[in-house]
Amino acid sequence: MELKDKLPNLYKNIDETLESAKLILSEAVPNTQTLFHTPVVSTIHENKIVSRVMVLREFNFDNKILRFHTDNRAAKIDNITKNSSSTVIGYDPDLKIQIKMQGHTEVHIDDEVAKMAWNESTPRSKKCYSVKGGSTKEIGDPQAVSYTHLTLPTTPYV
């Protein structure tokens, strides 16, 4: 059964809306085909909004946790450390649903949360975090990329 078939045709109350959002975000974690797998995460840098698409790695409705991974060398770490306010938004035109969440972001480095995230990461993801110079560095020649061994990624929570 497709996700669209599991959702109501008409939302009559907030409980139905929340249940649908829970279902959509729960399915977005493992399903790379849904647009909610890669929502836009916005933070603040020097009084300006900075937005980027990030991969949703965990959704826990009861604890109000969304987990995303990022390289601890990325500029967003400094942004989040200085101002934890954040917004996450996703939209799927086929479902005709937008989900917007606001909250505060926590950065986890070298702690149990980060270790768990690293251990659950795929070899491909780990390779992305081991590019010398950081994952946001422009690469002129992909064949000339060298890697270093990193033990843990940063794991921001929204």
How should these model regions be labeled?
Residues 1-150:
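Binding-site signature for planar aromatic cofactors or substrates
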Residues 149-158:
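Single conserved hydrophobic/aromatic residue that forms the stacking wall/gate
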